């Protein structure tokens, strides 16, 4: 039984590539059938944002930018499914509301990030960019992302040759 897991642990994948090259198998040379594919999808949003943010100034407003960002996330997830070709289950999960113990840590990190940004803007001049804190459970962006991802993949099991697609949005508790 084969399971492929794509995780969103910062720097963990690059650590594996550097230190355990023998673990990597090119997916196109992988001969066994993959049954289940699990996505920790927040990293997919950040990957799409990294690419799209270079074009932020070309969008008339944040809604258009966010719609394009969501579209890219859907397409990227779909491409991963098509490349891996699991035959049973796909789980698409986004981080939900964190446990109380972690909320303070996140709040402190966001506050520090905002202060650093203010200092850099003062030194280098203000950059016009989309507010990344929108990638937080409960924001309008994440609610819109939840709805769109759910609608994009809902009832599409046959199209991908799957038994089940499970979506867990950011409105559900847990990480």
Regions from the language model: what does each represent?
Residues 2-175:
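Noncatalytic, typically N-terminal accessory segments of nucleic acid-processing enzymes
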């Amino acid at each position: 039984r084969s399971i492929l897991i794509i995780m969103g642990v910062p720097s963990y994948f690059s650590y594996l590539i550097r230190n355990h090259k023998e673990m990597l198998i090119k997916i196109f040379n992988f001969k066994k059938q993959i049954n289940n594919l699990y996505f920790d999808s927040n990293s997919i949003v950040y990957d799409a944002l990294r690419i799209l943010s270079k074009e932020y100034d070309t969008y008339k407003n944040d809604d258009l930018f966010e719609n394009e960002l969501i579209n890219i996330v859907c397409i990227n997830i779909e491409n991963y499914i098509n490349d891996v070709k699991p035959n049973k289950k796909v789980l698409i999960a986004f981080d939900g509301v964190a446990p109380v113990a972690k909320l303070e840590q996140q709040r402190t990190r966001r506050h520090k990030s905002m202060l650093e940004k203010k200092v850099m803007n003062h030194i280098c001049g203000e950059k016009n960019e989309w507010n990344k804190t929108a990638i937080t459970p409960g924001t309008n962006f994440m609610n819109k992302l939840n709805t769109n991802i759910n609608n994009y993949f809902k009832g599409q099991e046959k199209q991908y040759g799957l038994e089940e697609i499970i979506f867990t949005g950011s409105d559900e508790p847990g990480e």
